[in-house]
């Protein structure tokens, strides 16, 4: 059998194909005869061939970038979060539909993930078990071509990245309804790790199970928070079904897979991992429930153009009048927007506190750099935990 090499597709050929594709009213018009339908299918096949050839060409170009850097004697950073954010923003800005922006971003994320895996598959530790929203955050940010490592605690995630057993880690930092994950903040007090990315994930709760109908459900298992977030839907649709709180939504999904009559409330990733059917989608009572996750790494990265910086600072004697104002005044003077501030006990001495601050911009931007230099002079403790691309959605 002779294997034919894929026909090379140039940028001009892709542009020609794009011009030949139907647009506007013609794109919406359905074929009215069998012959017309076959013609449309033939065009789809041709476009698929071009897409596949272009994706492979992109993968070859990505390999060339890595080889070129290695030959020059540079330390090769195969994963560049600032570059990936720029690519995603460009894809979003080009999008004219009919695909939604979210779908375009997901497709480009997976293409970049697959291309990166050809060079150096990333190992990403996350707060497990499998099927949790944290795993969904990993896949949203890195794509499905990474090696995702579920761990039992936030401490373990930090340790895996600190010891270089994992390239990156993903941990929750705050939820729009539940507030801050304090243990994540506290871990930064003793860790050298940097923040090199963020993920903002809309928490979508789905009812899932192995059965085909709601009438076959005898009990619904989920984490207590998820049960509370879906209280009204459960009251309206399954008022007589037992609600069983469990340690995690992943545990709920496992029980739904293994126990006859059990269903689970969990995220879409849990349905994929445990092979369950989604019986009812997005059953949460509030549609604005969002969790923010941080991506942990061992180094800082260059600006992407739309960035956020996270600081760890202390003013020393926080009981002195105006101490916090004097600490933060340089941000206002240099017109740097503060988006979040949290206080935590410093663990150094009684009633001594540190502040975790999020602000707009990258630490290397001149305006931000001037503000931080002034702030550093007023602080008894000052650390830039990270400057990283804002979540692309």
Task: Briefly describe each language-model feature range.
Residues 2-393:
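Domain-level signature for soluble enzymes in the chorismate/prephenate branch of the shikimate pathway
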